[in-house]
Amino acid sequence: MKVVNILEIADVNEALLNAGVPARVRLRDACGGQALWVEVSRGAVAEKDDAAVLAAAREVVGSYFAGRAKPVAFDDDGKSFRLA
């Protein structure tokens, strides 16, 4: 089973920052598995702009993990994701 490590979270968050996307990837890791999601920075954008920010974040996150042979699949909410 592929897993995401904390260094990858730091790297993907840096990639989001460098791309100008006001969002961060969050990781909750437990013995039952990992939960990953994108969190939009509330101070940076209005709630009505969440969809555009999430779309940009999905692009950056998808590209980052695909480059590491760890493609991701986003859930219907557009925020939560897992390794595919």
Predicted regions and their residues:
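Short glycine-rich, basic-tinged beta-strand/loop micro-motifs
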Residues: L27-K48, D76-S80
